[in-house]
């Protein structure tokens, strides 16, 4: 049994006073001081971990004013603004109050198409804005690898930039106005002002008072600023004194806020300029035999007028080849006898197709000549059009996350990852950089914006090893020396954060002026203190080796507990699971709640914190209880559960709340670049949690469902009468379940027999073994799953009819529990027992050489996932479409004329963990003469039995409304098909529409042939 875990530290009296002041002044957002929220917000996309004292989630601009005023008379309250949490240098981490604006302040307020600008709240995600204005031919240009979760407020705070910055510049180049809140509670509106306009502002106005001081600081130090700020595409930001006066000589007050990392003000809104979206695009993937050749070639490539040039080394490329994204891009990286050690991605854009084709032809001819003459590059491929090009950029954007997935205790991490030097110096700079890393015998990955002189370098360190602190210091100091030598910067695009200790060195004699800017806005040093600058040159700044590392907490975890926590221990905080896109499957609970605890990153962080606290409590491994032990200890568990309901604290309860919200859809398992698999460690947690507390009745009902249904199928009218009666619904609701589905009304074994097919009984298998080779070659055994067999028996019959019409001789394997519901709810010992018995029966058929196929993707993929994770050896049970795609031959099929257009809504688990299997449906439909389009769609919100839980009903409904419902309700031209039983039942529940399985559609087509 696990022990009760006390809170690590109680909320301080000052934080309590702050909360009271907030509530007293009408704060509309949420306030959080719980351990779970603080643990989740203690990390970002960096190597550091700082637990905040509390978190607040403001709803609007007035809330920002309220919170700074509430903190005004509490000098111990420090404020740390947070956007998307994608910063790589702990910009949003701190021990005070985190202000997370992403939950509520995420609205696009206004878009002016004619004048090409948008007004947005600070929490708007960059890609979200672009998706809204794409059809108008516009886009917000600064591009980031984290663009699907990075907020525009965060981009402004770090003056972010990325791919394409040579053409489009940094974020500051697109900021027209900023509305922010100062620590005094004043609203600070910044824009470009002429000297006359600035002088005309009243002395009492915030803009006039601050603007005149900033102008004076700039003009008094103009020469020093010019000599200090290097002439780079990625200028020295935070604070950008050089651009206080713009090229026209006007005063640009935005320049100081851009790149200030929340140390001067809380950004509320921004007016930003939009660019015309090029209508024509092409991308060259240029291959090299060495990474240095790719770097050396960059200068020549830039002379051809490319929009952007990105580079990727072989380490990143090899990791991409193992990722699901590779299926979409592998055609552009054909295998070669030569070693591929680096690539340059060279993009050309235009508004005229003919002009672009001339550029493509000219550049392609140049590359052919280089390859023929034995130059730097040896091959290239071309992607045309936005769809193909975006697929390659998606692969490039996943590079940062993919590096974290290397199979080693030493992971490539960010701390010197955004150095910037003049592009002409890049190859020499990187050569010495690599020598430094090689000297320390470190592995590393490299990728980045070669056209801008910015390369992302991630040395591999084991952050649990105390030596890593020494290496972080040693390498950073040497890299600082190198950037100085090559006239560059340590911080090229990711901001300073904890690396601010080097600011005095880079600013030199200008540093006191930088401090004067800080003092003007935040004289008490309460806004993100320790970063960029203090109000005086003597104010201490954070140091890279004095801020706690994530690995320092991880090092406390015992080996056994680390194994139980699984992939939670490898999450690097990249935040890919925070994707705003409602049509992206990861992560549905985040999209519905906007609660960072309800994300793979949040759950991984909580699992790590949980096993750390268990280790601190001298727990060496998680308990493993049999069902019998769980039952006999139930009374004691019930007492502890009643104590829990009465308010007895246990950190495990907070972790349980986050785990209970997980749909176990496994999208994270397939889509996370690190392959963080929440369902796997969630099951481990639930198994251990219920060693101390009583399981709810719903878990027992769902866990035993595969045993209940075969019995209930013998009396379907009785069962259906109960679930449809008011008393039945009341009882189920009391147990925690809602909308229980009806049984089909006929036993699947009897239905198959009535249709003229056989059961794969031992006697029949013996008969098959002795049959002719021709007959034996047609055999296939359908493995049942409880949901299809008992809730959609007609679908099982359709499966047999389709197989029969296509020339196979199918038989039905006798029903045996698969165990998936047991695994989902953490009955791990029971699951292992069920799985082992089931596997034994599967092996009997497999050893005969007869293919095994399953229908429901979630249940069928369990054999290749959960079974193997649990150490159960199991034969290959194929998804039906994979079997058909492999077995059918076009010459043996007479295609039926296509009369319908079909759209396929694939199950989350299938789409994210077996994407090629989804494409198999297209192949099968095409062989039979039918058109099938795969729809890009999010999660339906049902996920097995998740949507049937009373506690999750509303969340399930929200998830359905976000992606599935609008597509289901609006698309009346095509016939929609869904592979998942849970998906089809969700559509029936909320849209009252019957959606078929692809097999049922094929059955109709073949019946008419």
Give the predicted meaning of each segment.
Residues 155-157, 165-168, 175-395, 431, ...:
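C-terminal substrate-binding/cap subdomain adjacent to the FAD-binding core in PCMH-type
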Residues 22-23, 46-79, 97, 101-146, ...:
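N-terminal glycine-rich flavin-associated loop
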């Amino acid at each position: 049994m696990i022990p009760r875990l006390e809170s690590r530290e109680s909320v301080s009296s000052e934080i309590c006073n702050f909360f009271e002041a907030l509530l007293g002044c009408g704060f509309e957002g949420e306030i959080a001081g719980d351990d779970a929220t603080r643990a989740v917000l203690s990390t970002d996309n960096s190597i550091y971990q700082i637990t905040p004292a509390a978190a607040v989630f403001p709803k609007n601009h007035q809330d920002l004013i309220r919170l700074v005023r509430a903190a005004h008379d509490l000098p111990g309250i420090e404020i740390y603004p947070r956007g998307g949490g994608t910063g790589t240098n702990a910009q949003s981490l701190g021990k005070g109050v985190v202000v997370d604006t992403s939950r509520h302040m995420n609205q696009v307020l206004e878009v002016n198409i004619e004048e090409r600008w948008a007004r947005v709240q600070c929490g708007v995600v960059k890609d979200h804005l672009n998706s809204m204005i794409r059809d108008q031919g516009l886009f917000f240009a600064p591009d980031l690898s984290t663009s699907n979760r990075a907020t525009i407020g965060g981009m402004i705070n770090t003056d972010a930039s990325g791919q394409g910055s040579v053409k489009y510049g940094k974020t500051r180049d697109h900021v027209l106005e900023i509305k922010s809140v100062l620590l005094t509670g004043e609203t600070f509106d910044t824009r470009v002002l002429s000297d006359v306009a600035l002088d005309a502002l009243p002395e009492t106005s915030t803009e006039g008072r601050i603007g005149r001081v900033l102008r004076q600081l700039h003009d008094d130090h103009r020469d020093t600023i010019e000599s200090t700020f290097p002439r780079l595409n990625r200028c020295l930001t935070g604070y950008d004194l050089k651009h206080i006066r713009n090229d026209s000589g006007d005063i640009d007050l935005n320049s100081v806020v851009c790149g200030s990392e929340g140390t001067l003000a809380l950004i509320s809104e921004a007016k930003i300029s939009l660019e015309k979206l090029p209508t024509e695009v092409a991308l060259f993937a240029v291959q090299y035999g060495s990474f240095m050749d790719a770097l050396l070639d960059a200068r020549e490539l830039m002379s051809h007028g490319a929009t952007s040039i990105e580079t990727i080394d072989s380490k990143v490329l090899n990791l991409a080849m193992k990722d699901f994204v590779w299926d979409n891009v592998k055609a552009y990286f054909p295998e070669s006898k030569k070693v591929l050690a680096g690539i340059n991605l060279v993009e050309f854009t235009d508004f005229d197709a003919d002009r672009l084709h001339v550029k493509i032809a000219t550049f392609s001819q140049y590359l052919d000549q280089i390859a023929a003459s034995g130059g730097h590059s040896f091959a290239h491929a071309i992607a045309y059009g936005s769809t193909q090009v975006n697929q390659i950029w998606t692969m490039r954007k996943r590079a940062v996350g993919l590096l974290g997935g290397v199979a080693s205790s030493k992971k490539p991490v960010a701390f010197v990852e955004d150095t910037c030097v003049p592009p002409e110096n890049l190859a020499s700079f990187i050569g010495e950089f690599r020598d430094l890393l090689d000297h320390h015998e470190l592995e590393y990955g490299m990728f980045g914006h070669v056209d801008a002189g910015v390369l992302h370098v991630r040395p591999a360190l084991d952050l649990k090893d105390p030596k890593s602190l020494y290496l972080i210091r040693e390498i950073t100091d040497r890299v600082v020396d190198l950037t100085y030598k090559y006239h560059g910067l340590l911080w090229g695009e990711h901001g300073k954060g904890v690396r601010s200790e080097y600011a005095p060195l880079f600013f030199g004699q200008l540093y006191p002026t930088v401090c004067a800017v800080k003092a003007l806005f935040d004289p008490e040093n309460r806004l993100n203190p320790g970063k960029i600058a203090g109000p005086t040159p003597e104010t201490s700044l954070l140091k890279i080796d004095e801020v706690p590392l994530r690995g320092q907490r991880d090092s406390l975890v015992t080996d056994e507990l680390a194994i139980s926590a699984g992939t939670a221990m490898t999450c690097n905080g990249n935040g890919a699971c925070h994707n705003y896109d409602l049509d992206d499957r990861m992560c549905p609970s985040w999209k519905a709640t906007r609660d960072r605890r309800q994300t793979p990153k949040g759950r991984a962080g909580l699992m790590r914190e949980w096993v750390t606290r268990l280790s601190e409590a001298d727990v060496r491994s998680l308990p493993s209880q049999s069902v019998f032990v769980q039952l006999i200890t139930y009374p004691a568990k019930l007492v502890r559960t009643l104590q829990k309901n009465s308010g007895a604290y246990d950190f495990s309860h907070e972790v349980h709340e986050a785990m209970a919200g997980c749909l176990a859809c496994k999208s994270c398992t397939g889509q996370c670049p690190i392959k963080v698999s929440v369902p796997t460690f969630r099951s481990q947690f639930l198994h251990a949690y219920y060693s101390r507390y009583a399981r709810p009745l719903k878990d027992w009902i769902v866990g035993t469902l595969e045993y209940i249904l075969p019995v209930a199928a013998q009396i379907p009218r009785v069962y259906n009468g109960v679930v449809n009666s008011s008393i039945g619904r009341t009882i189920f609701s009391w147990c925690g379940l809602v909308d229980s589905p009806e049984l089909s009304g006929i036993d699947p074994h009897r239905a198959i027999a009535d249709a003229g097919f056989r059961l794969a009984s031992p006697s029949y298998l013996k008969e098959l073994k002795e049959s002719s080779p021709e007959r034996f070659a047609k055999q296939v055994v359908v493995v049942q799953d409880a949901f299809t067999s008992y809730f959609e028996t007609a679908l099982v019959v359709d499966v047999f009819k389709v197989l029969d019409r296509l020339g196979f001789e199918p038989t039905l394997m006798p029903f045996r529990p698969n165990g998936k519901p047991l695994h989902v709810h953490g009955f791990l010992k029971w699951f292992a027992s069920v799985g082992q018995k089931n596997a034994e029966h599967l092996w009997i058929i497999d050893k005969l050489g007869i293919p095994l196929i399953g229908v429901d993707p979630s249940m069928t993929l369990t054999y290749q996932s959960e079974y193997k994770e649990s150490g159960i050896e199991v034969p290959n049970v194929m998804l039906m479409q994979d079997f058909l795609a492999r077995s059918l031959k076009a010459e043996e099929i007479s295609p039926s004329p296509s009369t319908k257009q079909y759209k396929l809504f694939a199950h989350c688990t299938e789409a994210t963990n077996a994407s090629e299997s989804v494409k198999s449906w297209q192949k099968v439909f095409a062989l039979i003469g039918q058109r099938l389009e795969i729809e890009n769609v999010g999660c339906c919100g049902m996920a097995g039995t998740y949507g049937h839980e009373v506690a999750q009903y509303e969340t399930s409904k929200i998830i359905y409304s976000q992606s599935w419902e609008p597509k289901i309700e609006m698309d009346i031209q095509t016939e929609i098909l869904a592979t998942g039983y849970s998906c089809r039942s969700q559509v029936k529940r909320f849209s009252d529409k019957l959606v078929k399985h692809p097999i049922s559609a094929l059955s109709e087509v073949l019946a008419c042939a």
